[in-house]
Amino acid sequence: MGKAFFVVSQRVFWDVSMLSVFKPVIDVLPEVGAPARPPTLQKKLYWTLAGLLIFFILGQIYPIGVNPLDVRVQQFQQLEILLGSKMGSLITSGIGPIVLASIFLQLAVGAKLISLDLSNPENKKLFQGFQKILAIGLSFLEAIIYVWSGYIPIDSTAPLFGSMLATMAIVAFQLALGSIILLYLDEVLQKYGIGSGISLFIAAGVAQALFLGAFSFISASGGDMASGLVFQAAQYVSEGNVASAFWALLPLIFTVIVFLVVVYAEGMRIELPLSYGRARGLGARYPLKFLYVSNIPVILASAVLLNVQLMGMFLAHAGLPILGNYGTGSSPIDGVAYYLTPLQSPLFTPGGYQGYLGTILTTEGMLHIFAYGFALVSLSVLFGWFWVESTGMGPRQVAAQLGRAGLLIPGFRQDPRVTEKILERYIPVITILGAGFVGILAWFADITGALGTGTGILLTVGILYRFYEDLAKQQVFEQYPMLDKILK
């Protein structure tokens, strides 16, 4: 096993020696030091708020060489929400490189493509360092794609150093730098704040979209009507037009409905009784949540569909409209890309919600709705199944974990194979049902025009739920310090 990599059963494994090649680079990369003593809850809240403030400030800073007025934002709304990004700003790529690096490596380890014992502190440090290198590399790669493909328009009126090529290179460097800043900001929040910086940035982006969609008093089209739905409804009511006020509030109503359904689904679970084999009378319960794979499937499915849209735009601009042709607003107007693209939000549709209904309640509109829905739900189920099988969440892996902990299901032999057969009755079913459910819910939110998009709402509810749990745990540990020591 002295080779850097080897082949077993047609699978390529990377071992420690292969990753050790990157150790000199890992050693010189800046790292956020761990706190000398655990921060108090108050300090964690301060750090969290400071991180949020920096995130919002970065979203308002545009790179030198980019004219903010030329940036097209509308068609990238879903991408911004998923990646915690702001098109055209320093955080155009958002957390995309960080998330992609994490997903690639976790799937590689789970699928045994990388042979690495992460319980070993040295291996874990090496893995995290390599993940950081990959995230930095992806930051530059994505920045180059955004600039060279024309998604981020370069200001051609005053090229830097008199060269468009130099301007593009400088803009790409600034975009990559923005993602790297978010990478280290995430590291700061993980060690000094509450929860994960990545989750916080996504939730902040969705919350901002919800707030502006509901309460913005600025007109989107330059007219007298405010773009915020609440102000629109109030203006219609003042004019005696109650019906139009109802239509204006409809996306907000659907947002609340989707939010409540997700909150309810988060609490649905099956609890399997367990007992300790060596200690009779002591028992526990193993919860299998209905959303067993959380919102991971719909994130990956949405990312695939968004990449189809971006790839279609890139090919169309290159004179190869294989996936479809694109209109002046950089939105697909036909082809595969058109049918796999979410419908335009009622907020951006001429005539508001009534105009939106007039668009979708046609043969072409219905075909678009169901083609997009079928693709989103099918991909969600596929990714849900793949995620369970590749990340150690399948029946066999869970049964092995319970066996190592000395836990068994009462009334059955203490044999991992028996536990596996029992888990096989539940895990595959709830994986398919849960992944399909989040896909359908995201599709429903998209076609009804819910603010923040369906995927964004699903993400935010899950993130806020875990944020609340972390906050409550921190508060308990501060009140009872001995409990923290016992659990550690």
Residue ranges of each PLM-predicted region?
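Core subunits and conserved enzymes of cellular information-processing
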Residues: F5-K488
